[in-house]
């Protein structure tokens, strides 16, 4: 669930940045206000900071987890997870945090990640979406589109509801089905639902 929420949020941010570039000329001609990539990035940073202020709400053990500032503080772990590109964890850590020898190990990151509830990413998605939602209407109506898509994630045989063992030489994988709601006028995701692939 956390992987999905992070993927949806990252997809939303990336898509918004691309769409902003492609429609900016049209929006300027129409006299509309347009959110630029810097504004979108600031909105995401602000949403993460707001979560950090109440990080105990998103901790597996409130009062114990995320109380000290460690090598992987809460406010860095969230954007780090959003920035994953599919490499090994060690490479992801080096890419995101640089070659600083004081950066924590992959084991330390895994421990830190386990202290953050999956609901943190769901909350971030909704808070971020609300912060960029200008409630624009088209002829008095809000135009929404809903579409579904499958997302293959790492194989986990312990989750039989989404596990596919693979056949004909194909690797095993787990499958999630994502239904996302998109505002066609504002070009933002406003909601999403994750379901097991079976």
Per-segment meaning from a language model:
Residues 3-198:
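Conserved, well-structured functional cores that handle cations and Mg-NTP chemistry
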